[in-house]
Curated annotation (Swiss-Prot):
Protein name: Ribosomal RNA large subunit methyltransferase H
Keywords from the UniProt entry: Cytoplasm, Methyltransferase, rRNA processing, S-adenosyl-L-methionine, Transferase
GO cellular component, one term: cytoplasm
Keyword Transferase: yes
Organism: Ureaplasma parvum serovar 3 (strain ATCC 700970)
Binding site for S-adenosyl-L-methionine: 76, 108, 127-132
Length: 159
């Protein structure tokens, strides 16, 4: 069992990449964690609702290639459950105790996630009602996963 953090689009900001890599190393101290980045689709100059759905559908197909049938999937979505760090820790513990497969956190690209990802997800999670830059959201997710595992293992990180 491991945690997979699946996101759409490669980050260009070195500062975000460095922070994510640091948190991934910390997470791996407690539980194996893998970062998976699927390529985002190019956007036409003038984007219609139809082409937006096609883009999200193609990105969803790439995401699904990295999810196994029995994986527990958490989709990040603004219009969803906002929970505390302590509650996330309890939920991760519950998921680890209940499911024998991987736990997958999914972060969409700039256009969000396709409806099929939301339908497949076992849980919807929001970090805030605010919108964050893609890289910042990924850093925040990694930090919260590390914090949750630190809480579960009585680490000194969470005070």
């Amino acid at each position: 069992m491991m945690i997979k953090i699946i996101s759409v689009g490669k980050l260009k900001q070195k500062a975000f990449v460095d922070l994510i890599n640091d948190y991934l190393k910390r997470i791996n101290h407690y539980l194996k964690c893998q970062e998976i980045v699927v390529s985002d689709e190019p956007e036409p100059v003038q984007i219609s609702n139809k082409s937006l759905e096609q883009i999200k559908s193609k990105e969803a197909s790439k995401i699904f290639k990295n999810i196994n049938q029995n994986d527990f999937v958490i989709a990040l979505i603004i219009e969803s459950n906002i929970i505390s760090s302590e509650t996330l820790a309890k939920k991760i513990q519950q998921w680890l105790n209940t499911f024998s497969h991987d736990i997958c956190f999914i972060i969409g690209g700039s256009n969000g996630l396709h409806e099929s990802i939301y339908e497949r997800a076992n849980y919807h999670l929001s970090m805030s009602k605010m919108t964050f830059a893609h890289g910042l959201a990924k850093v925040m997710l990694c930090e919260q996963i590390y914090r949750a595992l630190s809480i579960l293992n009585n680490g000194k990180y969470h005070k």
